[in-house]
């Protein structure tokens, strides 16, 4: 989140009068630009850090709220939401555990496309093995297999939990942009004071 706030007592802010309004106008314009610059920087960092499969996560990195008052400006950049709930765990890392079932089903190579996206869920392939070209399915040693007349194929690994390492893309983008943010906000203040 980007935040700019004029801090001081009410008497000082009142003395600034119209100058304060000019400074805040310039800061608002600068913050709006920086908000969009940060979106792009986070998307660039995401491309560098994560293997892009569907593009959903990178597409969820968007400008969030933008609130401006006489003394405060706040601009946010958001990622995730909806089906992209995993954005936070990619940024910070953590352990995923099943909620309503006993195991997580992790797709193995035969159950994924070339870009690594699951072709179907374990539930779907169990309910209708023919969607994957199988005649049946079965579990053995923590693996869901698909059966064909020619043999068996491992499709999903069953896990009680999976720990993902932190793969930050938002925080590094903000750190890389810090000099630009400081420079552009200082310039906006100077321009507002000169008006």
State where each predicted segment sits.
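Short, Lys/Arg-rich flexible segments
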Residues: 1-195
């Amino acid at each position: 989140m980007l935040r700019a706030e004029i801090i001081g007592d009410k008497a000082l802010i009142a003395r600034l009068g119209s100058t304060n309004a000019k400074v805040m106008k310039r800061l608002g314009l600068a913050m709006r630009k920086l908000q969009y610059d940060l979106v792009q920087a986070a998307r660039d960092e995401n491309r560098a850090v994560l293997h892009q499969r569907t593009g959903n996560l990178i597409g969820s990195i968007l400008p969030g709220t933008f609130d401006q008052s006489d003394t405060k400006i706040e601009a946010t950049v958001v990622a995730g939401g909806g089906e992209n709930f995993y954005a936070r765990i990619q940024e910070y890392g953590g352990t995923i555990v099943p909620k309503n079932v006993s195991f997580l089903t992790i797709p193995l190579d035969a159950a994924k496309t070339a870009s690594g996206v699951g072709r179907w869920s374990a539930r779907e392939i169990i309910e209708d093995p023919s969607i994957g070209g199988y005649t049946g399915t079965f579990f053995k040693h923590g693996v869901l297999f698909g059966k064909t007349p020619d043999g068996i194929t491992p499709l999903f690994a069953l896990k009680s939990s999976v720990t993902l390492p932190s793969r930050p893309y938002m925080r590094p983008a903000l750190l890389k942009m810090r000099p630009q943010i400081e420079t552009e906000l200082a310039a906006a203040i100077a321009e507002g004071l000169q008006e």
